[in-house]
Amino acid sequence: HFRLAIMNTDVRRGVRIKKEEIMAVDFENSQTKKNLEAAFAGESQAHTKYEYYASKAKKEGYVQISNIFTETSGNEKEHAKLWFKYLHNGEVPTTAVNLADAAAGENYEWTDMYAGFARTAKEEGFTEIAAKFALVGAIEKAHEERYKKLLSSVEDGSVFSREGVKVWKCLNCGHLHVGATAPKVCPTCNHPQSYFEEQVVNY
């Protein structure tokens, strides 16, 4: 809880007594939390926007300006991370928590947000935008399903283990390992198991 201390005095029998009145504010219901959420949203938006600006400046031949936009975008990203961590007890949550949160966010986007946006755009005569809202909503649905599947893999310990023989690829050096489970350590570059993924050939 954030606490505000207010000092005042009380006079009793000629003795000046200092009292401290403590007003406790629950963080979850505080204006400060709302301000942190607004700050996180604003900085995140600025980070993304400046990346677009940097790309445009570079295309127009302003390399120095592009670099400044890129640098500032990085600053905004760190500002956003600072506020995000305050909103989550001083740290980024675990991957399992993040996957669950991401799935919930994607669910809201495709079931509520984009569905409503598409309906409104269509009613207002913006048919192209309505169609784009609907198409992106379908993508968000796929995102939700992917996050849920990944969360299930984290929870049941199958991220680095599969039924049957699989080919695992080290994302650092490209080493290929055949087996049901990825090796604990890459025998070629010594990177940990976390660098392995099941190889999927799509060419």
Identify the meaning behind each predicted range.
Residues 22-203:
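Non-heme di-metal
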